[in-house]
Regions:
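Surface-exposed, beta-sheet-biased, low-hydrophobicity segments with strongly acidic/polar composition
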Residues: 5-140
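Surface-exposed, glycine-biased beta-strand/turn segments
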Residues: 116-217, 249, 258, 262, ...
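Residues located in well-ordered beta-strands
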Residues: 44-46, 189, 230
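Extracellular/lumenal mature domains of secreted and surface-exposed proteins
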Residues: 287-407
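Extracytoplasmic
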Residues: 28, 40, 59-61, 112, ...
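A residue-level detector for short acidic-glycine micro-motifs
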Residues: 47-49, 175, 192, 233-236, ...
Length: 407
């Protein structure tokens, strides 16, 4: 049976459960999963293989073989991958057990078996239309980001002499200090804001992993699904946002900042958790698919270029740049062009590159579709000197404002 991940709300009432059903499996285990539309799908977890780097032994990708109603497919995990359609379902794998090997910050996952899967009916929304908006007034991928268990890397957070990994289970969106406006992704009840907690909710901090919801730079809201959304590192919080207040979807929360444990770079740390009904603890919910879908609904882009996640390599080591996660919503992608920091260019979604000098590189991907739409993204490559791994590489988070409605 699928795990009992609750949609129970701490508010007076709650909406119908979202489309996705969560299930955990061990290798070799099979389950019949009842979808939100009543259909039954048979899942069997066959094999898990991770792909790790040679510097920190960090998980960078995965090959998770699963049978869906007898059809075998391979899934990646997190790292800017959207759910995959197979048979009558859409399915993804937000986390698997191999992350625990060298990750001290593991409590947010609350993983009980070898891998966790989310399953939606084929063609359904990832999250109920009209119940979730993009939480920042900013263009998609305008700056650096950390998402889907990507190892934290901004401001030299990746260091080859340290194998203590912080896999970023929530979603960071980089921006410009005090400028980008943060809005509530959902309707809901403010349970914590500006270092104050609503009476009766003090115990939540002990059930949200290592996160303390009492913070001067953060706002926490429980929505009508019973999900917990957190907005952290804020430069300022709107005076109307106070514990006990019910907020509207899209209502201003505050402005982006680098306060608290931001690590020295300006970003929104967007936290999304659901409650595990069996343990009472809050579990990290990978928000990438919901952010992707809500951004498309609001801003209606024709093309979405994706060059992420970042990579960490030694000098002289080959890097594979991959733009195949890019999606055209209006036509077919006909061109992927890379522009490299050494001034060279290359055509094709997949490119190989070797760096002889240590440093941080930002390689630009330009994607064009058959309608003539163009979109850009960039891939950050951090390169360390193999002979002197103790030397940190310089890092910079470049940001600009505004990022939308530019003429």
């Amino acid at each position: 049976m699928p795990l009992a991940f609750s949609d129970i709300s701490c508010c007076d009432s709650y909406e119908s459960p979202v489309e996705r059903i969560v299930a955990e499996l061990n290798i070799g285990e099979s389950q019949n999963i009842k979808l939100s539309n009543g259909d039954i799908v048979h899942l069997t977890l066959l094999e898990i293989t991770d792909i790790r780097d040679s510097l920190r032994n960090a998980v960078r990708a995965a090959n998770i073989k699963i049978s869906v109603d007898g059809e075998e497919i391979s899934l990646n995990s997190g790292n800017y991958n959207l759910p995959v359609t197979v048979g009558k379902v859409q399915i993804d794998c937000p986390v698997f057990k191999n992350y625990y090997i060298n990750a001290p910050y593991d409590v947010a996952w609350e993983l009980l078996k070898d891998a966790r899967f989310r399953v939606w009916p084929k063609g359904s929304s990832y999250i109920k239309p009209g119940s979730f908006v993009y939480p920042i007034k900013q263009a998609w991928f305008a700056g650096k980001s950390q998402s889907g268990n990507e190892p934290a890397y901004v401001n030299t957070a990746e260091y080859p002499l340290s194998n203590k990994l912080y896999y970023h289970s929530f979603h960071d969106i980089g921006g410009t200090e005090g400028m980008d406006e943060i809005v509530s992704a959902t309707e809901g009840l403010v349970i914590s804001a500006n270092n104050e907690i609503l009476d009766g909710y003090d115990s939540i901090s002990t059930h949200v992993g290592w996160i303390d919801i009492k913070s001067p730079d953060a706002v926490y809201i429980i929505d009508n699904r019973g999900w917990l959304a957190g907005y952290l590192h804020l430069n300022s919080i709107d005076p109307a946002i106070k514990p006990g207040v019910k907020v509207r979807m899209g209502q201003k929360i505050g402005n982006i900042g680098m306060q608290g444990s931001a690590g020295g770079w300006v970003h929104l740390h967007f936290l999304l958790c659901t409650k595990d009904f069996s343990s009472g603890r809050w579990v990290a919910e990978d928000a990438y698919a919901y952010l992707w879908e809500s951004y498309i609904r609001q801003f209606k882009p024709h093309l979405m270029a994706v060059a992420r996640p970042h990579q960490l390599v030694w000098t002289g080591q080959e890097v594979i740049l991959d733009g195949r996660k890019s999606v055209s919503l209006a036509g077919d992608i006909i061109s992927c062009k890379w522009t490299f920091t050494d001034g060279t260019t290359a055509e094709g979604a997949i490119q190989k590159k070797i760096y002889s000098k240590p440093g941080e590189y930002s390689e630009i991907l330009k994607v064009t579709d058959s309608i003539g739409n163009v979109d850009y993204d960039f891939s950050v490559i951090q390169v360390y000197d193999r002979e002197h791994p103790e030397n940190p590489v310089p890092s910079m988070h470049a940001a600009y404002y505004p990022t939308i409605n530019i003429r």
